[in-house]
C-alpha cells in the first residue's frame, strides 16, 4: 500500500510529534515536531528534518552541528498522530551534547542525571 501523507493526523498547528530512536540499539534519542513538509523532506532526502516551533523554520538535524540523523525507517502509530523515526545518529542527539535528550531520570522522587555529555 502506498503511503499517503494526508492520512496522518496533525494537530491544530499542523504538527505531529516525532520520536527519534536509534535503529540498532532501540535507545530513544529525542522528540521533536514535524509538519507535512518536514515529513516529505525527510522521506525525499533521507536526512531527518523537523519543524522548529521556536524559530518557525525547518530544522535539518545536524545541519549546523554535524550530528546528522539518517532515516532508516519511519513508523506510524495506530492513531496516525505520532511518528517513530528509526534512525542512524552521528554523535549526540541532544543540544546538551548528550547521546539522548532523555538524560534525567526520576528515581524515588528525585531527579537524577543518568547520561553525561559526550566528549
Curated annotation (Swiss-Prot):
Q: How is the cofactor bound?
A: Binds 1 Mg(2+) ion per subunit. Binds 1 zinc ion per subunit.
For the ligand (Mg(2+)), the binding residues are: 77, 79, 81
Signal peptide: which range, if any?
none
**Catalytic reactions on record:** 1-(5-phospho-beta-D-ribosyl)-5'-AMP + H2O = 1-(5-phospho-beta-D-ribosyl)-5-[(5-phospho-beta-D-ribosylamino)methylideneamino]imidazole-4-carboxamide
Provide a GO biological process annotation: L-histidine biosynthetic process
Keywords, alphabetical: Amino-acid biosynthesis, Cytoplasm, Histidine biosynthesis, Hydrolase, Magnesium, Metal-binding, Zinc
- What GO CC terms are in its UniProt record? cytoplasm
Compartments it resides in: Cytoplasm
Question: What is the first-listed, main subcellular location in coarse terms?
Answer: cytoplasm
Q: Which domain of life is it from?
A: Bacteria
Does the keyword field hold Amino-acid biosynthesis? yes
Keyword Zinc tagged: yes
Q: Name one GO molecular function term.
A: magnesium ion binding
Return the Gene3D superfamilies for the record: Phosphoribosyl-AMP cyclohydrolase (3.10.20.810)
Instruction: Indicate the quaternary assembly.
Output: Homodimer.
UniProt family annotation: Belongs to the PRA-CH family.
Q: What does this protein do?
A: Catalyzes the hydrolysis of the adenine ring of phosphoribosyl-AMP.
Protein's name in the database:
Phosphoribosyl-AMP cyclohydrolase
Amino acid at each position: 500500500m502506498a503511503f499517503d501523507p494526508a492520512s496522518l493526523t496533525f494537530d491544530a498547528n499542523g504538527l505531529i510529534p516525532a520520536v527519534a530512536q536509534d535503529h540498532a540499539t532501540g535507545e530513544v534519542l529525542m522528540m521533536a515536531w514535524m509538519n507535512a513538509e518536514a515529513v516529505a523532506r525527510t522521506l525525499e532526502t533521507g536526512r531527518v528534518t523537523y519543524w522548529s516551533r521556536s524559530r518557525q523554520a525547518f530544522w535539518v538535524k545536524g545541519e549546523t552541528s554535524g550530528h546528522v540523523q539518517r532515516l532508516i525507517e519511519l513508523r506510524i502509530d495506530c492513531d496516525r498522530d505520532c511518528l517513530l523515526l528509526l534512525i542512524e545518529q552521528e554523535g549526540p542527539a541532544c543540544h546538551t551534547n548528550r547521546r539522548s535528550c532523555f538524560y534525567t531520570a526520576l528515581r524515588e522522587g528525585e531527579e537524577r542525571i543518568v547520561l553525561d555529555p559526550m566528549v
